[in-house]
Amino acid sequence: ADSPQLRAAKGEALVARAYAHFVLVNLFGKPYNAQTSTTDLGVPYIDFPINNFRAERPRNTVAEVYQYIEKDLTEGLPLLDDTYYKVPKMHFNKKAAYAFAARFYLYYTKWAKAEEMATEVLGDTPTNLRNWIAFQALGNNDPHAKEYTREGVEANLMLASVSSYARRFIDGQTVGRFAHSRGTAVRETFRDANNLWTNNYKDKQYESFRVDASKYIYTKYPTYTGNNTQIVLFTTDETLLVRAEARILQKNYTGAVADLNLFAKAYFMDEPQFTMSQIVSGYQNIPYSSYDPTSKLSHATQKKRLSPEFTIDNDQENLLHFLLQC
């Protein structure tokens, strides 16, 4: 039987399959590289029913996995229909699916397609970016995290439930070295002296908020008892930055700077608007992070050496450094 509802379900299934394999290939394979991905091993692409989950299957190359993902997206996106969802943001609704497609094409180095998919989500001038001012009226513990993941926030395109006992056994001190720590903030991001937006972001008072995980209940099934049970998979903010990056790599600097300024206006207190020359000269004068293998001393800055498999010029590099700070 065929019906509009079944076609919509098929569309979401295709997009979900594409997303699952996208996550897996970037976890177990190398990043996409036009020069090497035809031989780099990726993951098996399961596009057929399986009965034996333990059977060994040959790994597709990274290039093959990306081709299959694109095929699923091309077939699945036109079939989506949000009218069948009771809770759209827990599904691959249209905007979430196009946001994923934008991210995928950015990884796939198909910049024009990434820009096209992002614009499907945002329109030419998005008005649904995250309202960071709303965080100022909240407490600095659970309410802050819950507001970020709240279904009603227009900037949140898709949510997912998660369940993990890791936080019960690994405290913040243990994993702090891998997190956005105070040292990172001082030398590389928010509080760095070279920061173009001068430590002036709208949710600044919550830069050191914490979550009290001292009391918890073990449940048989995932339940929404705290702020660690729901995550945001796609947002308008990230999709805007995907489009900005795609425009930078196409040398559409006017469009890229416009997108970066939309993000800056939403996030920073004085709502700054930068020119391209300000961004390029600002990052041009920042030294690269460095490490001396003899003394084993490191000097961390906002600026890391970028090593893409494609060529970028000076203007593109410095615009990308700005984007990476957003």
Model regions and ranges:
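Residues that mark the junctions of alpha-helical repeat units in TPR/alpha-solenoid scaffolds
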Residues: 3, 10, 17, 87-90, ...
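Aromatic-anchored glycine-rich loop motif in surface-exposed flexible loops
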Residues: 1-82, 86
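Hydrophobic-face positions in mid-chain alpha helices that act as interaction patches
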Residues: 113-237, 260-261, 267-310, 317-318, ...
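Alpha-helix C-terminal capping/termination sites
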Residues: 23, 27-30, 107, 242, ...
